[in-house]
Protein backbone atom coordinates (compact mmCIF):
# COMPACT_ATOMS: atom_id res chain seq x y z
CA UNK A 1 0.00 0.00 0.00
CA UNK A 2 2.84 2.39 0.90
CA UNK A 3 4.51 1.78 -2.47
CA UNK A 4 1.23 2.42 -4.29
CA UNK A 5 0.74 5.77 -2.49
CA UNK A 6 4.34 6.71 -3.26
CA UNK A 7 3.81 5.91 -6.95
CA UNK A 8 0.73 8.16 -7.09
CA UNK A 9 2.65 10.97 -5.40
CA UNK A 10 5.48 10.67 -7.90
CA UNK A 11 3.07 10.77 -10.84
CA UNK A 12 1.36 13.90 -9.50
CA UNK A 13 4.66 15.62 -8.76
CA UNK A 14 6.04 14.83 -12.21
CA UNK A 15 2.85 15.95 -13.96
CA UNK A 16 2.69 19.20 -11.98
CA UNK A 17 6.28 20.07 -12.85
CA UNK A 18 5.71 19.41 -16.53
CA UNK A 19 2.40 21.19 -16.91
CA UNK A 20 3.87 24.32 -15.31
CA UNK A 21 6.92 24.26 -17.58
CA UNK A 22 6.97 26.28 -20.78
CA UNK A 23 8.50 23.44 -22.79
CA UNK A 24 6.63 20.16 -22.59
CA UNK A 25 8.59 17.03 -23.51
CA UNK A 26 8.98 15.93 -27.09
CA UNK A 27 8.22 12.24 -27.56
CA UNK A 28 9.46 9.69 -30.11
CA UNK A 29 8.12 6.14 -30.12
CA UNK A 30 10.28 3.76 -32.18
CA UNK A 31 8.49 0.50 -33.02
CA UNK A 32 10.34 -2.49 -34.46
CA UNK A 33 8.40 -5.02 -36.50
CA UNK A 34 8.58 -8.62 -35.23
CA UNK A 35 11.50 -8.40 -32.77
CA UNK A 36 11.74 -10.41 -29.55
CA UNK A 37 12.89 -8.77 -26.33
CA UNK A 38 15.95 -10.99 -25.95
CA UNK A 39 17.24 -10.20 -29.45
CA UNK A 40 18.51 -6.78 -28.30
CA UNK A 41 22.02 -6.41 -26.90
CA UNK A 42 21.08 -4.67 -23.65
CA UNK A 43 18.78 -7.61 -22.84
CA UNK A 44 21.70 -10.02 -22.97
CA UNK A 45 21.73 -11.16 -26.61
CA UNK A 46 25.16 -12.32 -27.74
CA UNK A 47 24.10 -12.19 -31.40
CA UNK A 48 22.59 -8.71 -31.61
CA UNK A 49 24.49 -5.63 -32.76
CA UNK A 50 22.34 -2.85 -31.34
CA UNK A 51 24.82 -0.23 -30.04
CA UNK A 52 22.41 2.70 -30.28
CA UNK A 53 19.56 1.05 -28.37
CA UNK A 54 22.10 -0.22 -25.85
CA UNK A 55 23.41 3.33 -25.29
CA UNK A 56 19.87 4.61 -24.76
CA UNK A 57 19.32 1.90 -22.14
CA UNK A 58 22.64 2.65 -20.41
CA UNK A 59 21.67 6.32 -20.07
CA UNK A 60 17.95 5.76 -19.54
CA UNK A 61 15.65 3.02 -18.27
CA UNK A 62 15.44 -0.58 -19.52
CA UNK A 63 12.08 -2.16 -18.73
CA UNK A 64 12.44 -5.89 -18.07
CA UNK A 65 8.73 -6.68 -17.70
CA UNK A 66 6.95 -4.90 -20.55
CA UNK A 67 4.08 -6.98 -21.93
CA UNK A 68 2.12 -6.70 -25.18
CA UNK A 69 -1.64 -7.15 -25.42
CA UNK A 70 -1.29 -9.18 -28.64
CA UNK A 71 1.63 -10.77 -30.47
CA UNK A 72 0.16 -9.68 -33.78
CA UNK A 73 1.00 -6.56 -35.78
CA UNK A 74 -2.18 -4.51 -36.08
CA UNK A 75 -3.94 -5.60 -32.85
CA UNK A 76 -0.78 -4.82 -30.88
CA UNK A 77 -0.23 -1.39 -32.47
CA UNK A 78 -3.92 -0.58 -32.12
CA UNK A 79 -3.68 -1.24 -28.39
CA UNK A 80 -0.70 1.10 -28.08
CA UNK A 81 -2.38 3.97 -29.91
CA UNK A 82 -5.78 3.71 -28.17
CA UNK A 83 -4.64 2.49 -24.74
CA UNK A 84 -7.19 -0.36 -24.96
CA UNK A 85 -7.22 -4.14 -25.13
CA UNK A 86 -7.62 -5.62 -28.63
CA UNK A 87 -11.17 -6.90 -28.09
CA UNK A 88 -12.13 -3.42 -26.84
CA UNK A 89 -11.00 -1.88 -30.14
CA UNK A 90 -13.80 -3.43 -32.21
CA UNK A 91 -12.77 -5.49 -35.21
CA UNK A 92 -9.13 -4.49 -34.60
CA UNK A 93 -8.73 -7.49 -32.31
CA UNK A 94 -7.87 -9.34 -35.53
CA UNK A 95 -5.11 -8.75 -38.07
CA UNK A 96 -5.78 -6.23 -40.87
CA UNK A 97 -8.95 -4.91 -39.24
CA UNK A 98 -9.70 -1.26 -38.37
CA UNK A 99 -10.05 0.33 -34.97
CA UNK A 100 -13.63 1.33 -34.15
CA UNK A 101 -13.89 4.91 -35.41
CA UNK A 102 -15.36 6.38 -32.23
CA UNK A 103 -12.22 5.56 -30.23
CA UNK A 104 -9.63 8.36 -29.89
CA UNK A 105 -5.97 7.77 -30.73
CA UNK A 106 -3.65 9.41 -28.21
CA UNK A 107 -1.57 11.33 -30.83
CA UNK A 108 -4.78 13.11 -31.82
CA UNK A 109 -5.19 14.39 -28.27
CA UNK A 110 -1.59 15.64 -28.36
CA UNK A 111 -2.21 17.33 -31.71
CA UNK A 112 -5.32 19.07 -30.39
CA UNK A 113 -3.26 20.35 -27.45
CA UNK A 114 -0.53 21.94 -29.55
CA UNK A 115 1.82 19.09 -30.45
CA UNK A 116 3.12 18.54 -33.98
CA UNK A 117 2.47 14.86 -34.76
CA UNK A 118 3.87 12.56 -37.44
CA UNK A 119 3.65 8.88 -38.37
CA UNK A 120 6.56 7.70 -40.50
CA UNK A 121 6.90 4.07 -41.54
CA UNK A 122 4.48 1.22 -40.97
CA UNK A 123 0.91 2.16 -40.05
CA UNK A 124 -0.93 -1.18 -40.03
CA UNK A 125 -3.62 0.00 -37.65
CA UNK A 126 -6.36 1.54 -39.77
CA UNK A 127 -7.13 4.61 -41.78
CA UNK A 128 -9.29 7.48 -40.58
CA UNK A 129 -12.20 6.01 -42.56
CA UNK A 130 -15.13 5.10 -40.30
CA UNK A 131 -16.88 1.81 -39.96
CA UNK A 132 -20.46 1.72 -41.20
CA UNK A 133 -22.69 3.94 -39.08
CA UNK A 134 -19.84 5.53 -37.13
CA UNK A 135 -18.45 9.03 -37.17
CA UNK A 136 -15.25 10.25 -38.82
CA UNK A 137 -12.29 10.86 -36.51
CA UNK A 138 -10.54 14.22 -36.69
CA UNK A 139 -7.04 13.95 -38.22
CA UNK A 140 -4.59 12.16 -35.94
CA UNK A 141 -1.27 13.18 -37.52
CA UNK A 142 -0.03 16.40 -39.10
CA UNK A 143 2.26 14.37 -41.36
CA UNK A 144 2.22 10.76 -42.60
CA UNK A 145 4.91 9.13 -44.73
CA UNK A 146 5.83 5.57 -45.70
CA UNK A 147 9.44 6.17 -44.66
CA UNK A 148 10.67 4.34 -47.75
CA UNK A 149 13.31 5.44 -50.25
CA UNK A 150 15.14 3.78 -53.17
CA UNK A 151 17.42 1.14 -51.69
CA UNK A 152 15.69 1.26 -48.31
CA UNK A 153 12.15 0.00 -47.90
CA UNK A 154 12.53 -0.45 -44.15
CA UNK A 155 10.24 2.43 -43.19
CA UNK A 156 12.98 4.56 -41.62
CA UNK A 157 14.66 6.34 -44.55
CA UNK A 158 12.94 9.68 -43.82
CA UNK A 159 13.00 9.69 -40.01
CA UNK A 160 15.83 12.23 -39.75
CA UNK A 161 14.26 14.38 -42.45
CA UNK A 162 11.01 14.43 -40.47
CA UNK A 163 12.88 15.64 -37.38
CA UNK A 164 14.62 18.36 -39.38
CA UNK A 165 11.51 19.65 -41.12
CA UNK A 166 9.21 19.86 -38.11
CA UNK A 167 7.95 23.27 -36.97
CA UNK A 168 10.40 24.44 -34.32
CA UNK A 169 7.83 26.37 -32.27
CA UNK A 170 5.89 23.28 -31.12
CA UNK A 171 6.62 20.20 -29.04
CA UNK A 172 6.43 17.07 -31.19
CA UNK A 173 5.28 13.47 -31.08
CA UNK A 174 6.72 11.09 -33.69
CA UNK A 175 5.48 7.53 -34.26
CA UNK A 176 8.51 6.06 -36.06
CA UNK A 177 7.59 2.52 -37.11
CA UNK A 178 10.12 0.38 -38.93
CA UNK A 179 9.33 -2.56 -41.20
CA UNK A 180 12.44 -4.26 -39.81
CA UNK A 181 12.52 -7.15 -38.95
CA UNK A 182 9.46 -8.39 -40.85
CA UNK A 183 9.93 -11.10 -43.43
CA UNK A 184 11.04 -11.31 -46.29
CA UNK A 185 14.33 -9.73 -45.17
CA UNK A 186 14.42 -6.58 -47.28
CA UNK A 187 17.57 -5.59 -45.40
CA UNK A 188 19.52 -8.49 -46.92
CA UNK A 189 18.76 -7.24 -50.42
CA UNK A 190 19.80 -3.63 -49.79
CA UNK A 191 22.55 -4.07 -47.21
CA UNK A 192 24.92 -1.11 -46.88
CA UNK A 193 28.00 -2.35 -45.05
CA UNK A 194 29.40 1.18 -44.80
CA UNK A 195 26.44 2.09 -42.60
CA UNK A 196 25.52 -1.13 -40.84
CA UNK A 197 28.80 -3.04 -40.71
CA UNK A 198 29.21 -6.65 -41.89
CA UNK A 199 26.24 -8.96 -42.09
CA UNK A 200 25.73 -11.37 -39.23
CA UNK A 201 27.63 -14.63 -39.62
CA UNK A 202 25.23 -17.61 -39.51
CA UNK A 203 27.89 -19.59 -37.66
CA UNK A 204 27.73 -17.17 -34.74
CA UNK A 205 23.97 -16.75 -34.20
CA UNK A 206 22.17 -18.17 -31.18
CA UNK A 207 19.64 -20.86 -32.12
CA UNK A 208 16.76 -21.12 -29.60
CA UNK A 209 16.18 -24.64 -28.28
CA UNK A 210 12.75 -24.80 -29.94
CA UNK A 211 14.29 -24.42 -33.43
CA UNK A 212 16.37 -27.00 -35.32
CA UNK A 213 20.04 -26.07 -35.57
CA UNK A 214 20.91 -26.45 -39.25
CA UNK A 215 22.38 -24.17 -41.97
CA UNK A 216 19.05 -22.88 -43.30
CA UNK A 217 17.79 -21.98 -39.82
CA UNK A 218 21.07 -20.24 -38.99
CA UNK A 219 20.90 -18.20 -42.20
CA UNK A 220 17.28 -17.34 -41.43
CA UNK A 221 18.30 -16.05 -38.00
CA UNK A 222 21.30 -14.15 -39.38
CA UNK A 223 19.06 -12.35 -41.89
CA UNK A 224 16.65 -11.49 -39.09
CA UNK A 225 19.44 -10.00 -36.99
CA UNK A 226 20.64 -7.98 -39.97
CA UNK A 227 17.31 -6.18 -40.00
CA UNK A 228 17.49 -5.49 -36.26
CA UNK A 229 20.91 -3.89 -36.79
CA UNK A 230 19.50 -1.70 -39.56
CA UNK A 231 16.63 -0.60 -37.29
CA UNK A 232 19.18 0.27 -34.61
CA UNK A 233 21.28 2.30 -37.07
CA UNK A 234 18.43 4.63 -37.95
CA UNK A 235 17.58 5.15 -34.29
CA UNK A 236 21.18 6.30 -33.89
CA UNK A 237 20.77 8.74 -36.78
CA UNK A 238 17.72 10.32 -35.14
CA UNK A 239 19.50 10.59 -31.79
CA UNK A 240 22.49 12.25 -33.48
CA UNK A 241 20.19 14.80 -35.14
CA UNK A 242 18.51 15.60 -31.83
CA UNK A 243 21.93 16.05 -30.22
CA UNK A 244 23.02 18.37 -33.03
CA UNK A 245 19.88 20.45 -32.51
CA UNK A 246 20.33 20.40 -28.71
CA UNK A 247 16.85 18.87 -28.48
CA UNK A 248 17.79 15.50 -26.96
CA UNK A 249 17.61 16.53 -23.30
CA UNK A 250 13.84 17.07 -23.23
CA UNK A 251 12.89 14.34 -25.71
CA UNK A 252 11.41 11.15 -24.30
CA UNK A 253 12.53 8.31 -26.58
CA UNK A 254 10.88 4.90 -26.26
CA UNK A 255 11.94 1.81 -28.21
CA UNK A 256 9.73 -1.28 -28.43
CA UNK A 257 8.45 -3.99 -30.78
CA UNK A 258 4.93 -4.95 -31.82
CA UNK A 259 5.41 -8.70 -31.31
CA UNK A 260 7.96 -11.48 -31.09
CA UNK A 261 10.33 -12.66 -33.80
CA UNK A 262 8.69 -14.11 -36.96
CA UNK A 263 9.82 -17.65 -36.19
CA UNK A 264 8.12 -20.79 -34.86
CA UNK A 265 6.94 -20.54 -31.24
CA UNK A 266 7.33 -16.76 -31.11
CA UNK A 267 5.12 -14.38 -33.12
CA UNK A 268 1.39 -14.76 -32.21
CA UNK A 269 2.25 -16.80 -29.07
CA UNK A 270 0.95 -15.94 -25.60
CA UNK A 271 4.26 -17.11 -24.16
CA UNK A 272 7.08 -14.64 -23.44
CA UNK A 273 8.62 -15.39 -26.84
CA UNK A 274 5.59 -13.64 -28.34
CA UNK A 275 4.34 -11.17 -25.71
CA UNK A 276 7.42 -9.94 -23.86
CA UNK A 277 8.59 -6.82 -25.71
CA UNK A 278 11.86 -4.94 -25.42
CA UNK A 279 11.12 -1.52 -23.97
CA UNK A 280 13.81 1.11 -23.51
CA UNK A 281 13.15 4.69 -22.43
CA UNK A 282 15.64 7.58 -22.64
CA UNK A 283 14.90 11.07 -21.35
CA UNK A 284 17.81 12.99 -19.81
CA UNK A 285 15.53 15.67 -18.35
CA UNK A 286 13.04 13.23 -16.86
CA UNK A 287 14.66 9.93 -15.82
CA UNK A 288 16.27 9.69 -12.40
CA UNK A 289 18.96 7.08 -11.68
CA UNK A 290 19.74 6.64 -15.41
CA UNK A 291 21.08 3.24 -16.35
CA UNK A 292 19.09 1.47 -13.63
CA UNK A 293 16.73 -1.13 -15.13
CA UNK A 294 13.27 -1.78 -13.74
CA UNK A 295 11.49 -5.04 -13.06
CA UNK A 296 8.15 -3.24 -12.66
CA UNK A 297 5.37 -4.75 -14.76
CA UNK A 298 3.81 -2.58 -17.47
CA UNK A 299 1.39 -3.23 -20.33
CA UNK A 300 1.60 -1.43 -23.66
CA UNK A 301 -1.88 0.01 -23.01
CA UNK A 302 -0.06 2.09 -20.39
CA UNK A 303 1.91 4.04 -23.00
CA UNK A 304 -0.98 6.32 -24.03
CA UNK A 305 -1.88 7.58 -20.52
CA UNK A 306 1.81 7.93 -19.67
CA UNK A 307 2.64 10.14 -22.65
CA UNK A 308 -0.53 12.20 -22.29
CA UNK A 309 0.06 12.76 -18.59
CA UNK A 310 3.65 13.87 -19.14
CA UNK A 311 2.42 16.30 -21.80
CA UNK A 312 -0.18 17.74 -19.44
CA UNK A 313 -3.05 16.32 -21.50
CA UNK A 314 -5.97 14.53 -19.83
CA UNK A 315 -6.17 10.88 -20.98
CA UNK A 316 -9.44 9.95 -22.68
CA UNK A 317 -11.97 8.06 -20.50
CA UNK A 318 -11.82 5.24 -23.07
CA UNK A 319 -8.21 4.43 -22.13
CA UNK A 320 -7.80 1.34 -19.94
CA UNK A 321 -4.12 1.69 -19.11
CA UNK A 322 -2.20 3.27 -16.23
CA UNK A 323 0.55 5.88 -16.31
CA UNK A 324 4.00 4.47 -15.53
CA UNK A 325 5.58 7.94 -15.21
CA UNK A 326 6.51 7.10 -11.60
CA UNK A 327 9.00 4.49 -12.88
CA UNK A 328 11.00 7.24 -14.59
CA UNK A 329 11.69 8.70 -11.15
CA UNK A 330 11.86 5.45 -9.18
CA UNK A 331 12.75 2.17 -10.93
CA UNK A 332 11.22 0.21 -8.04
CA UNK A 333 7.81 1.91 -8.28
CA UNK A 334 4.88 -0.47 -8.79
CA UNK A 335 2.26 0.55 -11.35
CA UNK A 336 0.28 -2.64 -11.98
CA UNK A 337 0.07 -6.15 -10.56
CA UNK A 338 -1.31 -7.95 -13.62
CA UNK A 339 -0.91 -7.86 -17.41
CA UNK A 340 -3.44 -9.44 -19.79
CA UNK A 341 -2.89 -10.55 -23.39
CA UNK A 342 -4.91 -12.04 -26.26
CA UNK A 343 -4.44 -14.35 -29.23
CA UNK A 344 -7.07 -13.83 -31.91
CA UNK A 345 -7.16 -14.47 -35.65
CA UNK A 346 -3.83 -13.89 -37.38
CA UNK A 347 -3.99 -15.91 -40.61
CA UNK A 348 -5.53 -18.80 -38.65
CA UNK A 349 -8.54 -19.39 -36.40
CA UNK A 350 -7.51 -18.80 -32.80
CA UNK A 351 -8.75 -17.67 -29.41
CA UNK A 352 -6.44 -17.66 -26.40
CA UNK A 353 -5.99 -15.46 -23.34
CA UNK A 354 -3.30 -14.99 -20.71
CA UNK A 355 -2.54 -13.20 -17.46
CA UNK A 356 0.87 -12.49 -15.95
CA UNK A 357 1.04 -11.86 -12.23
CA UNK A 358 3.68 -12.18 -9.51
CA UNK A 359 6.07 -14.33 -11.50
CA UNK A 360 3.48 -16.65 -13.07
CA UNK A 361 1.89 -16.90 -16.50
CA UNK A 362 -1.52 -18.53 -17.03
CA UNK A 363 -2.67 -19.29 -20.59
CA UNK A 364 -6.14 -20.45 -21.63
CA UNK A 365 -6.85 -21.83 -25.09
CA UNK A 366 -10.42 -21.89 -26.40
CA UNK A 367 -9.35 -23.74 -29.58
CA UNK A 368 -7.08 -26.48 -28.18
CA UNK A 369 -7.91 -28.87 -31.01
CA UNK A 370 -5.57 -27.05 -33.42
CA UNK A 371 -1.84 -26.33 -33.29
CA UNK A 372 -0.31 -22.94 -32.57
CA UNK A 373 2.00 -23.14 -35.55
CA UNK A 374 2.49 -19.37 -35.90
CA UNK A 375 1.57 -16.96 -38.72
CA UNK A 376 1.67 -17.96 -42.37
CA UNK A 377 4.94 -16.16 -43.16
CA UNK A 378 6.61 -18.05 -40.32
CA UNK A 379 5.13 -21.36 -41.52
CA UNK A 380 6.62 -20.71 -44.97
CA UNK A 381 10.02 -19.89 -43.47
CA UNK A 382 13.12 -22.08 -43.79
CA UNK A 383 13.16 -22.44 -40.00
CA UNK A 384 9.64 -23.88 -39.85
CA UNK A 385 10.10 -26.12 -42.85
CA UNK A 386 13.28 -27.48 -41.28
CA UNK A 387 11.26 -28.41 -38.18
CA UNK A 388 8.63 -29.98 -40.39
CA UNK A 389 11.24 -32.18 -42.09
CA UNK A 390 12.63 -33.27 -38.72
CA UNK A 391 9.11 -34.01 -37.51
CA UNK A 392 8.49 -36.27 -40.47
CA UNK A 393 11.67 -38.14 -39.55
CA UNK A 394 10.61 -38.41 -35.91
CA UNK A 395 13.63 -36.46 -34.67
CA UNK A 396 12.11 -33.48 -32.84
CA UNK A 397 12.79 -32.68 -29.20
CA UNK A 398 9.73 -31.90 -27.04
CA UNK A 399 10.53 -28.16 -27.24
CA UNK A 400 10.70 -28.33 -31.04
CA UNK A 401 7.57 -30.48 -31.31
CA UNK A 402 5.46 -27.91 -29.47
CA UNK A 403 4.77 -25.96 -32.65
CA UNK A 404 2.95 -28.99 -34.12
CA UNK A 405 1.18 -30.09 -30.94
CA UNK A 406 -2.54 -30.79 -31.46
CA UNK A 407 -4.57 -31.01 -29.42
CA UNK A 408 -2.86 -28.51 -27.14
CA UNK A 409 -3.52 -28.12 -23.42
CA UNK A 410 -6.55 -25.96 -22.76
CA UNK A 411 -4.73 -24.54 -19.73
CA UNK A 412 -1.04 -23.78 -19.23
CA UNK A 413 0.73 -22.43 -16.13
CA UNK A 414 4.38 -21.39 -15.92
CA UNK A 415 6.84 -19.84 -13.52
CA UNK A 416 8.35 -17.10 -15.65
CA UNK A 417 11.49 -16.70 -13.52
CA UNK A 418 12.45 -20.38 -13.31
CA UNK A 419 11.18 -21.33 -16.79
CA UNK A 420 11.77 -18.35 -19.14
CA UNK A 421 10.99 -20.40 -22.28
CA UNK A 422 7.78 -21.74 -20.71
CA UNK A 423 8.36 -25.41 -21.42
CA UNK A 424 7.28 -26.92 -18.06
CA UNK A 425 3.49 -26.71 -17.82
CA UNK A 426 2.49 -26.71 -14.13
CA UNK A 427 -1.28 -26.61 -14.68
CA UNK A 428 -1.73 -30.20 -13.48
CA UNK A 429 0.74 -29.91 -10.59
CA UNK A 430 -1.19 -29.95 -7.27
CA UNK A 431 1.54 -27.80 -5.69
CA UNK A 432 0.36 -24.91 -7.86
CA UNK A 433 -3.40 -25.43 -7.54
CA UNK A 434 -3.82 -22.28 -5.45
CA UNK A 435 -1.87 -20.16 -7.95
CA UNK A 436 -3.86 -21.62 -10.84
CA UNK A 437 -7.16 -20.87 -9.10
CA UNK A 438 -6.12 -17.30 -8.30
CA UNK A 439 -4.99 -16.52 -11.85
CA UNK A 440 -8.04 -18.22 -13.35
CA UNK A 441 -10.27 -16.03 -11.19
CA UNK A 442 -8.35 -12.93 -12.29
CA UNK A 443 -8.79 -13.87 -15.93
CA UNK A 444 -12.51 -14.49 -15.42
CA UNK A 445 -12.88 -11.12 -13.70
CA UNK A 446 -11.04 -9.36 -16.54
CA UNK A 447 -13.13 -11.16 -19.17
CA UNK A 448 -16.39 -10.03 -17.59
CA UNK A 449 -15.28 -6.47 -16.82
CA UNK A 450 -13.97 -5.79 -20.33
CA UNK A 451 -16.77 -7.57 -22.20
CA UNK A 452 -14.57 -10.23 -23.78
CA UNK A 453 -16.22 -13.32 -25.29
CA UNK A 454 -15.53 -16.51 -27.22
CA UNK A 455 -17.75 -16.36 -30.33
CA UNK A 456 -19.08 -19.61 -31.70
CA UNK A 457 -18.07 -18.64 -35.23
CA UNK A 458 -14.52 -17.32 -35.22
CA UNK A 459 -12.71 -16.15 -38.34
CA UNK A 460 -11.51 -19.32 -40.12
CA UNK A 461 -8.08 -20.26 -41.45
CA UNK A 462 -6.92 -18.30 -44.50
CA UNK A 463 -3.76 -20.36 -45.01
CA UNK A 464 -2.73 -24.00 -44.93
CA UNK A 465 -1.31 -24.88 -41.52
CA UNK A 466 1.39 -27.15 -42.95
CA UNK A 467 2.67 -25.08 -45.87
CA UNK A 468 1.53 -21.52 -45.14
CA UNK A 469 0.02 -21.27 -48.62
CA UNK A 470 -3.20 -19.29 -49.14
CA UNK A 471 -6.45 -21.30 -49.14
CA UNK A 472 -8.22 -18.84 -51.43
CA UNK A 473 -7.26 -17.44 -54.79
CA UNK A 474 -5.54 -14.06 -54.89
CA UNK A 475 -8.07 -11.26 -54.81
CA UNK A 476 -10.72 -13.23 -52.96
CA UNK A 477 -11.78 -11.55 -49.69
CA UNK A 478 -10.70 -12.95 -46.33
CA UNK A 479 -13.52 -14.83 -44.63
CA UNK A 480 -14.41 -13.27 -41.30
CA UNK A 481 -16.30 -14.59 -38.30
CA UNK A 482 -17.50 -12.75 -35.21
CA UNK A 483 -14.85 -10.71 -33.36
CA UNK A 484 -14.24 -11.35 -29.68
CA UNK A 485 -16.38 -9.10 -27.51
CA UNK A 486 -18.77 -8.19 -30.32
CA UNK A 487 -21.82 -9.69 -28.60
CA UNK A 488 -21.10 -7.47 -25.57
CA UNK A 489 -20.48 -4.30 -27.61
CA UNK A 490 -17.04 -4.27 -25.99
CA UNK A 491 -15.73 -1.36 -28.08
CA UNK A 492 -18.05 0.87 -26.03
CA UNK A 493 -16.93 -0.57 -22.68
CA UNK A 494 -14.14 1.24 -20.85
CA UNK A 495 -13.75 -0.82 -17.67
CA UNK A 496 -10.12 -2.03 -17.47
CA UNK A 497 -10.66 -5.03 -15.21
CA UNK A 498 -7.97 -5.98 -12.66
CA UNK A 499 -4.73 -4.06 -12.95
Predicted region positions:
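Mature extracytoplasmic/periplasmic domains
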Residues: 453-465
